[in-house]
Amino acid sequence: MMGTMTESMSDLKNALENLSPAQHGFSYLDLERAPVAEGDLSGWIIPAKDLYDVAGMPTTFGSKARTRMATETDPFIAAYEARGALIPGKSVSSELGLTVDAEPRDLPAVHNPIWPGRTPGGSSGGAAAMVARGLVRAAHGSDGGGSIRIPAAACGIVGFKPSATTLAVHGYLTTSVEDQAFLHQLEPVLDRPLRIGVLTTPIIADTEVQSEYLTAVAEAAEKLAAAGHEVIEVGGWPEAETTFDHFTNLFSYRLAELEHYDYIAEWLREKGLHVTAEQVRESETYARTLQARLAEHWGVDVILNPTIASDPPATGAFTSLPPAENFAAQARWVPWTSLFNIAGSCAISLPWPVPGRPQPAAVHLGSLTLDDAELLALARQLHV
C-alpha cells in the first residue's frame, strides 16, 4: 500500500535505494538537481512525464529508439518549476502515450505498487506508481484518452483531467483532491445542488463490469444523494460508435507522419494515413458540440461511473496481443474515459474502499456543465 510521503531530495534518495526502475517508475533520475525558483510549490518534488521535455534531461517518448536530449522545457512543466517545484527526473510512459499501460519499447515496464504483477495503468503509469508508493506527493501526467485517470484508478490515487479544447491535456496525479486544487491554482466552490447521472453501461466497448466497481459507484451515489444532490440512473449514449470513430480519427491522424514505428504505433499510423483533413475537421466540429449534446441527452450536470471496468490486468496482458486486439482489449478495460476527452470536459478519478481487501476500486466524475473548480468541489464531497 501507499508509503509515507517523502519531503526532501534526501528522503527521496533514501527511498529509492532498494527499488528497481520497475518499482519506482522513474525512466531518468537527476537527484542533484536544484530548484530554479521559489514560490508556492517550493518544497514540492514533481517528476515530469517522459513524453515531455525538461532541459538537460533525455526524453524517451516511451521508446529507447526515440530518445533525445532536451534543450528546452515544456511550457506546462516550466510553469510549475517556476512556482518552486523541483523536478528530480522523468516518469515512465507507454510509447507516445498510445496505450493504457506503462510498458515502453525496449525499456523497463513499471509494476503496480498495490497490485504486484499487474499493470499500473497508463500512459502516466510511472507517475501513478511513484505517487502510490509514497515517493512523491504529486507527479505530472497527461491525459489524451484517460491517461491520468486510468493509472490513478489502477494505483488507488487521485487523477484529474482539466477541461480542454484538445484531446490531450496536462495535469497531475496526487493522493488528494486538495492537492489537485492547489496545483491547478483553483478554489473549489460549489454553491448549488446538482443533478447527477449514474452510468454503469460501458460506452465504447461491450464488457462486463466487475462487481466491486459497481458497488463503489452505488455507494458514491448514495453519498452524493445524502449531500443534497439529485441522483438518477442514466442509460448509454446512442452515438457511442460515432463518437469513438471521431475520437480515433483525432487520435490516429497525428501519427500519420510518424517515424520509427512498429507494433501498435505502426497500426495506429496506418489508421491515421486513411484519415483525411476533411474528416479531421468534421471530427473537430463534432467534438466542439459534444459536451452540450451529452448534457441535453442525459439531462444532468455530471456523470458518475466506474473509472475502469475491473481490477488491473497482468503486466503484458495488452502488449502480448496483436495491435488490433490490444486496442480492443484496452477499450474493454476503460470503456468510459475517452468520452470526456473528445467532449473536452473536466473529469476526475477517485479511489473508493473495498471491504475485505487493501486495494480500492475507483469512481469517476465527468462534468457536462461544471467548470474545473466546481468539479473539484464535488469530488471533495467524496474524497478529501
Predicted regions, residues:
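Short, well-ordered beta-strand elements
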Residues: 359-369, 375-376
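Short glycine/serine-rich loop segments
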Residues: 73-74, 78-184, 346-351, 360-362
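Amidase signature
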Residues: 1-41, 186-334, 342, 356, ...
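ATP-grasp fold ATP-binding core
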Residues: 40-55, 87-90, 303-307
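Short, hinge-like loop/turn segments at secondary-structure boundaries
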Residues: 105-108, 155-159, 249-252, 321-323, ...
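Enzymes and membrane/adaptor proteins characterized by extended Gly/Ser/Thr/Asp/Glu-rich
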Residues: 42-76
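Short amphipathic alpha-helices in soluble, non-transmembrane regions
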Residues: 378-382
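A short acidic, glycine-rich active-site loop
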Residues: 65-71, 114, 118, 323-335
